[in-house]
Amino acid sequence: PGITXTSLHVAPGARLAVKGDIPAGAKSWVINLGKGENDIMLHFNARFDAHGDIRTIV
C-alpha cells in the first residue's frame, strides 16, 4: 500500500525531489524507482529505529 506514480520521464543526470509528511511513530519509509514492480533500479529504505538507535537515520 502506498502511492504509485507512473509515466515519469527522468533523463540521465536529472534530479528527483520527494516531499511529504512522515506520520509520528513511523519506523521507516521506502522509495522504489524502476520500470515495474519486478524491475527496480533504485531501492531507498530510510529506517528510524535501526539497531535500537532512534537518533540516526539508516
Curated annotation (Swiss-Prot):
Keywords: Extracellular matrix, Lectin, Secreted
Top-rank taxon: Eukaryota
Domain Galectin residue range list: 2-58
Binding residues for a beta-D-galactoside: H43, F44, N45, A46, R47, H51
MF terms (GO), sorted A to Z: carbohydrate binding
Tissue: Detected in most tissues, most abundantly in skin.
Statement: the UniProt record of this protein carries the keyword Signal: no
Main location: secreted
Pfam families cross-referenced by the UniProt entry: Gal-bind_lectin (PF00337)
Keyword Transferase: no
Localization in the cell: Secreted, Extracellular space, Extracellular matrix
Quaternary structure, from the entry: Monomer.
Cited function: May regulate cell apoptosis and cell differentiation. Binds beta-galactoside and a wide array of complex carbohydrates.
Name this protein carries in UniProt: Galectin-1
Species this chain originates from: Podarcis hispanicus (Iberian wall lizard)
